[in-house]
A protein has these predicted regions:
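Catalytic Walker B motif of ABC-type/P-loop ATPase nucleotide-binding domains
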Residues: 162-166
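ABC ATPase nucleotide-binding domains
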Residues: 228-229, 235-261
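Conserved ABC ATPase signature
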Residues: 137-141, 145
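Helix-to-loop junction immediately C-terminal to a conserved catalytic motif
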Residues: 53
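Conserved ABC transporter NBD signature motif
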Residues: 61-78
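Conserved ABC ATPase "signature" region
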Residues: 100, 115-133
Length: 261
C-alpha cells in the first residue's frame, strides 16, 4: 500500500445470509481527498462504510486504512458520523458528555477526562457554533444542532480520516450549507473525508472526486467526468437530466425507468 493512500479496498465482497450486497469491489482513496459516494437507497453504501470501519466482516477481500489491515475493530484516527436517525439517546447525556466520548481512545487506562480533553471539546464546540449548548441534554436540541454535536464528537478524536453517512439528511438548507463548508475547511487542513450523500449538486459543485455505487462501483473520478446521463442511469436505474453551464453541473430529479417497456 502506497504511503499516500488512505484507504485501499481489494476484491471486497459482502453477504448478509444469502443476500449478496456487492462483490469484487476495488477502490483506492488517497490522503487529503474529499470524496463523495452517491447511489440509491439499498445500494450497499453504508455497508461499504461499515467494512472500512471494521464494524462488520467481509465475505471476501481486504480493507486497509492508512496502511493497516482493518479487522474486527475500528482503526484509530477515524472519525465516523452515522445517519442521524440511526442515533438514539435514551439515557441522559449532555452535549459536553456526548462530545467527550470522542476522546475515550486518547485517555489511556483510566477513562477520565483531563484539562486537555475538556479544552479540545470546548474548542470543537466553539468552531461548530454550539458552545452555548454545552450543558444541555442532547435530546433537547434540533436535528441540525444534534448533527453538529455528532460532528464535534468525531472531531474531538483528532481524526486523520472523517467518514460521514448522509450528515445533511433531515436538516434545513442553512445547516446543510454550514456543515458542507465546515467540512471543506477541514479538508483544506489535510483531513481526508468520505461523504455519503444524495445531494448530487453539492458533490458536483464542491468535491474533487465522486464514486457512483450500486451493488459495486459503477464509475469513479471527477464529477465532470462521472456525472453523465448514461452513468447516472446505471447508478440509479433512472433517467437523470444533466445540465452543464461552464463548470457548473446541475442534476434534475431522477425519474425511474419504466420497466414494462
Amino acid at each position: 500500500m502506497h504511503e499516500q493512500t488512505m484507504i485501499e479496498i481489494k476484491n471486497l465482497s459482502c453477504k448478509y445470509g444469502n443476500n449478496e450486497i456487492f462483490k469484487g469491489v476495488n477502490l483506492k482513496i488517497e490522503k487529503g481527498i474529499f470524496a463523495g459516494i452517491v447511489g440509491p437507497n439499498g445500494s450497499g453504501k453504508t455497508t461499504l462504510i461499515k467494512l472500512m470501519l471494521g464494524v462488520i466482516k467481509p465475505t471476501n477481500g481486504k480493507v486497509y486504512v492508512n496502511g493497516g489491515l482493518v479487522k474486527n475493530r475500528p482503526p484509530f484516527k477515524i472519525g465516523y458520523i452515522p445517519q442521524l436517525e440511526a442515533i438514539e439517546w435514551d439515557f441522559p447525556v449532555t452535549v459536553e458528555q456526548a462530545v467527550m466520548m470522542g476522546r475515550y481512545n486518547k485517555m489511556g487506562i483510566l477513562p477520565w477526562s483531563n484539562k486537555e480533553d475538556k479544552r479540545i471539546v470546548r474548542d470543537v464546540l466553539e468552531r461548530l457554533g454550539i458552545i452555548q449548548y454545552i450543558n444541555h441534554h442532547i435530546k433537547t436540541l434540533s436535528g441540525g444542532e444534534q448533527q453538529r454535536v455528532f460532528l464535534a464528537r468525531a472531531l474531538a478524536s483528532e481524526p486523520e480520516l472523517l467518514i460521514l453517512d448522509e450528515p445533511t439528511s433531515g436538516v434545513d438548507l442553512k445547516t446543510q450549507h454550514d456543515i458542507l463548508h465546515f467540512l471543506l475547511s477541514l479538508n483544506r487542513k489535510g483531513i481526508t473525508i468520505i461523504l455519503i450523500t444524495h445531494d448530487l449538486n453539492a458533490v458536483a459543485a464542491h468535491l474533487p472526486r465522486v464514486i457512483c455505487f450500486n451493488k459495486g462501483i459503477i464509475a469513479e473520478g471527477r464529477p465532470e467526468d462521472v456525472f453523465k446521463p448514461d452513468i447516472l442511469k446505471k447508478t440509479y436505474n433512472a433517467d437523470v437530466t444533466v445540465v452543464r453551464s461552464g463548470s457548473l453541473i446541475l442534476m434534475a430529479n431522477a425519474k425511474p425507468l419504466n420497466t414494462d417497456d
